[in-house]
Amino acid sequence: MEQILKFLWYISTIILVFSILIHNPKSEGLGTIGSQNQFFSNTRSTENTLNKVTWLFLALFLLFTTILAIN
Amino acid sequence: MSQKSDLRNRIKFTLLLLVLARLGIFIPVPGIDHDAFYASVEKNTLVNFLNIFSGGGFSTIGIFALGIVPYINSSIVMQLLTKIIPDLEKLQKEEGELGRQKITQITRYLALGWATLQSGAISIWVKPYVFNWNFTFVCESVLALTAGSMIIMWLSELITEKGIGNGASLLIFQNIVSGLPKNFTQSFFDANYSNTSIKFGLFIVIFLLMIIITIFVQEGTRRIKIISARQLGKSSILDPNSYLPLKLNQGGVMPIVFASASMALPAYLTQLTQNTFLLQVLYLFCPNGSLYLVLYSVLILFFSYFYTSIVMNPEDIATNLKKMGASIPNIRPGQATIDYLQVILNRLTFLGATFLFTVALIPFIIEKVAQIQNLRGLGATSLLILVGVAIDTAKQIQTYVISKKYDSMTK
């Protein structure tokens, strides 16, 4: 059981990091603070799907980590 | 009506993400004896310093222990690199939106690398407190901490994009605020201190004073009168309403955030080296060292100038003025205007940075005079960030409301 959980944890974590990295944020990070364009963002549909996937794996990651920590 | 609820949704979204970011600090990385670790690092200056940015997550080694730090550090590195490497500068200046997105993307990869390195260092560092220390443990904690840091980065981007305010600075804000109660109790309710109430009163007064000074510094602008072709015919008197605002502190909080993040570097390095000479040199720059303040002031100055050069480019302003058919009275358009603006910007930035540093210095002096301990972690760094972020966010909300009003007007 523990092994399976560990395995799932690894998978979800790696996918999570990967899915966060392939995001292409409109916001320009810390670099150019105060740029006026941030309110004119139009989210593309791929970005939407990606967001959902990321949220899913984020939840899984948190869940698995918590369970592993309790054990 | 709809714009109001839209704003409300943005604020709700932001708060939700902040709560989530806070929650992750308390989910521990598996396999570590957290109680023993916590007890041993409580008095460690480095850990306390790092806790400022991660909201206490560092001493509990939660999965969000690294927090936003890797992202900030890689932003600093990238900002510096864009000035050094011509290709990157070209990306930032000439390729417009797409180029900047590319730079953001590189920054994120760099953040991943940084997070991996840092979490690797942590997983080796906590070795004495681990139940079963082996290669698997290192792999797992590196993975967990790196993922945590990436999540925080993503959350900060989400806040910037879909919430309100700047995500990264809001997260730092929240972490500092969450450390405040602990800081207060440590400073004032320790059994060793006498005259607690007087000191507390003094502290409150100074605290308020610092906030006021900080607000003045952050809000101060130099207004350069401009005159446009349209006005010329109407009257010979300058319209007092048309001016070019140049802020005293162009970079806002960013110089302070960057400077204080860089200040953690010497403290880090002391953990890595065993060489006594190197250690002695490095300790000079640690929070209790004699050169700490000097380095801090130099960094604030450096990042202020650096930021001003990024945010405000005199050449661009001059070109824009020309396009608008406006000019500064008594200054020729073109090169003369550029030079004039550059001189003013340089002076403003120097003044602004000096002010910032003076405010940062106050807690140190107070500490010496009133012998209050532990004020440092709160004072110098945090207060400036707190005030700056609060002002920034309030402004962004205002801007948002106004821009929504314009939108509904044109519809």
Curated annotation (Swiss-Prot), chain A:
Keywords: Chloroplast, Membrane, Plastid, Protein transport, Thylakoid, Translocation, Transmembrane, Transmembrane helix, Transport
Record membrane topology: Multi-pass membrane protein
Record-level Gene Ontology MF annotations: protein-transporting ATPase activity
Localization per Swiss-Prot or TrEMBL: Plastid, Chloroplast thylakoid membrane
GO cellular component, one term: chloroplast thylakoid membrane
Presence of keyword Membrane: yes
Transmembrane regions: 4-24, 50-70
Name of the protein in its database record: Probable protein-export membrane protein secG
Lineage, top ranks: Eukaryota, Rhodophyta, Bangiophyceae, Bangiales, Bangiaceae
From Swiss-Prot, chain B:
One of the record's GO cellular component terms: chloroplast thylakoid membrane
Cell compartments where the protein resides: Plastid, Chloroplast thylakoid membrane
Key words of the record: Chloroplast, Membrane, Plastid, Protein transport, Thylakoid, Translocation, Transmembrane, Transmembrane helix, Transport
Quaternary structure note: Component of the plastid Sec protein translocase complex, which is composed of at least SecY, SecE and SecG.
Name of the featured protein: Protein translocase subunit SecY
Family per similarity comment: Belongs to the SecY/SEC61-alpha family.
SUPFAM superfamilies the UniProt entry points to: Preprotein translocase SecY subunit
Key word Glycoprotein present: no
Source species taxonomy: Eukaryota, Rhodophyta, Bangiophyceae, Bangiales, Bangiaceae
Transmembrane spans: 13-33, 52-72, 111-131, 135-155, 163-180, 197-217, 252-272, 291-311, 350-370, 377-397
PROSITE patterns per record: SECY_1, SECY_2
GO biological process: intracellular protein transmembrane transport; protein targeting
Bilayer topology annotation: Multi-pass membrane protein
Purpose of the protein: The central subunit of the protein translocation channel SecYE. Consists of two halves formed by TMs 1-5 and 6-10. These two domains form a lateral gate at the front which open onto the bilayer between TMs 2 and 7, and are clamped together by SecE at the back. The channel is closed by both a pore ring composed of hydrophobic SecY resides and a short helix (helix 2A) on the extracellular side of the membrane which forms a plug.
